[in-house]
């Protein structure tokens, strides 16, 4: 059983120190509406007022439905501004450009979405002098469930050592 109060305080202080030492003005994170993004958003907001979540749907009907609704609810509940950027046209452009050399090989396109999201987050972060927060948990890292140079790319990850069970435990506490 975690000491959730201590875990939250320690992680929030770590983020504050990171912002101070890097000189960044705030934090941006990809908000899919899931548990990991929710916890990252809340902890980031507890550390600084300058936090932005970016909702980045890309082709999937789920991205435009329940996931999007959850992402918006989290932003509203915790006063975290959300920006929505539909990456579908960008992915379609990639397919058009690459179709002659790759064809319609699904696996070749499988990791484009997380890499487009990473590029979007870093472009926004650069423009606004922000750090990109990672949203992957320890369970995902242990299983290799992330995309190299996609959702595995970030400036810091405040939940990388937490299991799914621990994330739910902290979310219930908050």
Q: What do these predicted ranges mean?
A:
Residues 145-161:
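A mobile, often basic/glycine-rich helix-loop segment
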Residues 1-146, 171:
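ATP-dependent adenylation/nucleotidyltransferase module used to activate substrates
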Residues 56-60, 156-163:
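Short, acidic/turn-prone active-site loops that include or flank metal/cofactor-
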Residues 161-174:
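Short, flexible loop segments at boundaries between secondary-structure elements
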């Amino acid at each position: 059983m975690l000491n959730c109060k201590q875990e939250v305080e320690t992680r929030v202080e770590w983020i504050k120190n990171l912002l101070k030492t890097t000189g960044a003005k705030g934090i941006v994170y990809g908000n899919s509406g899931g548990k990991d993004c929710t916890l990252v958003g809340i902890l980031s907001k507890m550390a600084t007022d300058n936090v932005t979540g970016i909702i980045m749907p890309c082709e999937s009907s789920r991205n435009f439905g329940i996931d999007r609704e959850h992402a918006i609810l989290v932003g509203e509940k915790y006063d975290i501004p959300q920006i929505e950027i539909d990456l579908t046209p960008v992915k379609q452009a990639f397919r058009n450009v690459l179709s002659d050399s790759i064809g319609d090989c699904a696996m070749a396109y499988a990791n484009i979405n997380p890499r487009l999201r990473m590029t979007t987050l870093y472009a926004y972060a650069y423009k606004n002098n922000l750090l990109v927060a990672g949203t992957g948990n320890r369970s995902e890292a242990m299983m290799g469930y992330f995309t190299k140079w996609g959702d595995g790319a970030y400036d810091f990850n405040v939940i990388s050592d937490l299991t799914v069970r621990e994330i739910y435990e902290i979310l219930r506490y908050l």
